C-alpha cells in the first residue's frame, strides 16, 4: 500500500479498534488480526516517515527518555474531595445541600466507584492530545504527557469533530489487578522492587522519565470530569450528559456509574458496589457522589479545597493481626524462590486468609519478620494477601529468623542468589518439576531445537502423563505410545517422531540456547559457540573468561557457571548426547575474525534486491556480526536497501556508517 489516504484510513481503523477494545470492551477483531494491521502500519511508516500522523498508534511511545519533569499550572484548579467514613457523615452532606437548595424537592446524584489511582488532567487542543498533568497541589502539577500517551484507552485524537477548540478531561490513571500481578511477578523474577498495591505501582509508573517503562506496565484510565473548556462551548444541563459526550469523543468512563436519588439511593448503591468490590478488575476505595445538575453545582460552588456538591464515601480499611506460624518457599516457573507466610487463619475483608506473600529475602529482612511474630496482614488490592510487618510489642522471646534454603525443595538442586538482585533461584533448570513445562516449551521452540509437531498443549499432555520429565525423554518416545493419546492418529504420531529425530542434527549455538540457561539468549549462545567452539570447553569455562566475551556480563557469566555446575543438568545433557544429538565440526562454525563485520553491530533496513533480510542476517552472523532491530549510537553499520525509512534517517543523524546493498556485498569476504 503506497497511497497516503489509505494510510490515514489505516490509522483511523486501528484507533477505532483500540476504542472498541479498551473503552467499550467489545472488540470486533481478534488480537492477531490487530497485530497484522499494526505491523502493516509500521512497515508503511518505515517507508514513508513523512506520512506519520501524531495520532498514529506508533506514536504513543517516545524515542528518548526525559531528563526531568516540568511543572504546569492548571488553567482550572484540580480540587480534592471531602470524605465520609460513616453513614452519618453522608447524611450531614446531603442535609447541607438541601439547606442551601430549599426549592429542590428531589436531588439526583451521579454515583461511581472511587478509583484507587491518580488524578490526571489531559488537555486536547483542536482534538489533539497536547498535554497531561498530575494533580500536584491542585494548582500546579507535573507534566507526564509522555507516560499518558502509551495508555491505549486514552485517544491521541478525539473522535468526531464537534469538540471545542480546548477541552481538558480529568480522570484517574490506575493499574488493573491483572496488570499489577503480572508486574510484580516480573519484578520478582528480575529481583526488582515489589509494589505494595496497584496504586503505588501506577504512581511509580507515572514517575518514570522513560515512557517505554510506563508503556510496559499497562496502565488504564477512567474519566470523571473536565477542566478548562473553550468559552464558546455550551455545557449540557447534567453532569452525566457531559460524561456521555466525552465518551462519544473516545474517552472511557466507569461502566458501573449510575444516577441515583436521595439518601436511600446512596446507601443502596454503596452496598451494591461494596458487595461486588472483589469481583471488579480494578481497585476501588469508596464511592463518589456528585450532584447531577450542573447549574446546581455552580450555585453551591467550592470550599478552599473541595466542591460542596460532591463527596467520597470511603470503604473501611482491611487490615488485621494474626500469628505467623511458619515461612515456606515456593518455586516459580522461572526458578525464582519466593518465601510464603503460613498464617493462623483469619478473616480479612470477608475472606479467610491462611497464606500471604513475603516477596523476597530482602523484604523479610527490611520488615524484620520472624516466625512466631504477630503480624499485620493486608489484603493488598483486595486480592493478594500481604504481610505488612510485625507488631514488635507482641513479639515473644522464641521467634525464629528465616533462612533461605540452600537446596530447591522441588528438585534438590542448588539455590543461588543472583548478583546485585533480591531474587534467589533454583539452578536445576532442566530437571526442576516447577520449571519443567516452561523448560520443555523452550527446548522445542523454533529458535532452539525447532521440533515440528510438538506444540505446547501436546508437551503439557506428555508431562501430565509422566512420559516426559526432561528434554532427553522426547527421544525415547515411540509412534505406538503417542498414538494412544486422545486425538492423536498414527500418522500424526509419526510426524511428531520424525520431527523429534530430525532435531538431533543441530548446531552448537542452538543446542546451548535450547538448554534455557537464565539470561542466555540466541545472540549470547552464538557468541559462546563461536568463541569456545566445543561444548566441553563451554561447560568448563571459568567466570573470568566468560565475562570477557561480547554480550556476557557478570550476571550472565554466573548463570552459565551455576548451570553447568549442577549435576542434574549435566545428566540431562549427557542423555541428549547419548540419544544422538550432534552438530557440525568446529571448523564449519568458525567466524572469520578478519571480516570487517566481525563483532560489529549491524542494522538492516529497506528492501534488498539480492536476497531477503533473513538471508542477509544469516550471512552477516556467519561473519561474526550482531544484528539488531534499532539504530543507536552503538550501531557500527546500517545496510540500507530500497525504500529505507526512519532507521536510515536516524543513522544519518547519529553519524552511523551507512552502506548500500552493493557496498555491503563488496565488503563481504569472498568464499573459497
From Swiss-Prot:
Q: Entry's InterPro entries? A: BRCT_dom, BRCT_dom_sf, DisA/LigA_HHH, DNA_ligase, DNA_ligase_AS, DNA_ligase_CS, DNAligase_adenylation, DNAligase_N
What Gene Ontology cellular component terms go with this record?
Answer: cytosol
Q: Which residues form the active site?
A: 114
Provide the alphabetized UniProt keywords: DNA damage, DNA repair, DNA replication, Ligase, Magnesium, Manganese, Metal-binding, NAD, Zinc
The cofactors it requires, by name, are: Mg(2+); Mn(2+)
Is the keyword Acyltransferase in the record? no
E.C. designation(s): 6.5.1.2
> What's the superkingdom here?
Bacteria
What is the top EC class of this enzyme, as a single word? ligase
GO molecular function annotations of the record = DNA binding; DNA ligase (NAD+) activity; metal ion binding
**Which GO terms are recorded in the biological process aspect for this UniProt protein?**
DNA repair; DNA replication
CDD domains recorded: BRCT_DNA_ligase_like, LIGANc
Q: Provide the residue positions that the database annotates as binding Zn(2+).
A: 408, 411, 426, 432
The record's catalysed reaction(s) read: NAD(+) + (deoxyribonucleotide)n-3'-hydroxyl + 5'-phospho-(deoxyribonucleotide)m = (deoxyribonucleotide)n+m + AMP + beta-nicotinamide D-nucleotide
| Positions contributing to NAD(+) binding | 31-35, 80-81, 112, 135, 172, 290, 314
Q: What residue stretches are annotated with the BRCT domain?
A: 592-672
Q: Does the keyword NAD apply?
A: yes
Q: Which family does it belong to?
A: Belongs to the NAD-dependent DNA ligase family. LigA subfamily.
Sum up the protein's function in the record's words.
DNA ligase that catalyzes the formation of phosphodiester linkages between 5'-phosphoryl and 3'-hydroxyl groups in double-stranded DNA using NAD as a coenzyme and as the energy source for the reaction. It is essential for DNA replication and repair of damaged DNA.
Q: What is this protein called?
A: DNA ligase
Q: Which organism is it from?
A: Hydrogenovibrio crunogenus (strain DSM 25203 / XCL-2) (Thiomicrospira crunogena)
List the taxonomic lineage: Bacteria, Pseudomonadati, Pseudomonadota, Gammaproteobacteria, Thiotrichales
